Amino acid sequence: FLRKLIDENLIPDDVKVQVLTQSREHLITKTFEALKGCKNAIVHLYNSTSVLQRDVVFNMDKEEIIGIAVKGAKLIKEEAAKYPETNFQFEYSPESFTGTEMDYALEICEAVMDVWQPTSENKMIINLPSTVEMTTPNRYADQIEWFSKTIKNRDCVSISLHPHNDRGTSTAAAELGLLAGADRIEGTLFGNGERTGNLDILIVGMNMYSQGVDPELDFSNINKIAEIYKDCTKLPIHERHPYVGD
């Protein structure tokens, strides 16, 4: 799919495509091969950081998990240098941020920052996902506010939200997270995602419009967007869905 977009010159000049990779060498290499010839791209690195995943899935201590992140960050920096024709922006996620100790989430993100050396002109994205929605939206916003105020070199970082919808509160979490200091949101069309889904970017965008804030998303042909979505995914949109329901 990505090769089709690049080879057929289907990506507008003002659009960045985003790719997601685990901190594994062969996946990082393949990811950059897929991006060859792309004008603008975000390369998004992630690894699991929560207490549960460290203890049960990886059986690793904190330093070993940081080592995984740093190794991946170095590989991405090395691979990006091989493709000077592409304007890369780097992104890092401590997966399961909401299940991670806040001081440790900060530590691992700053370790990645030390590798990538972002600047105010070339910011890196730090994405703080509620990989499994575990608590109330105000608690998520508290975590975002603390992180935003505590991270070093804040002017060199764009803080991103990635709310899942396990508790049915992803929209509230996203809106409160923005008010708490986040710069960016990741979401999906009509909430399509694993388990109970991810944040519906359309709802947040339309909610922002209703409050006089332009999300810089074009919803002028929202019914056509819905038709294409249903045709491509073979998934229905609930008739009581906000803004696009029947």
Regions found by a protein language model. Name each.
Residues 13-21:
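A glycine-rich helix N-cap at a beta->alpha junction
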Residues 20, 46, 93-95, 127-129, ...:
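Generic beta-strand/beta-sheet core signal
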Residues 2-12, 25-159, 175-180:
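Alpha/beta enzyme core
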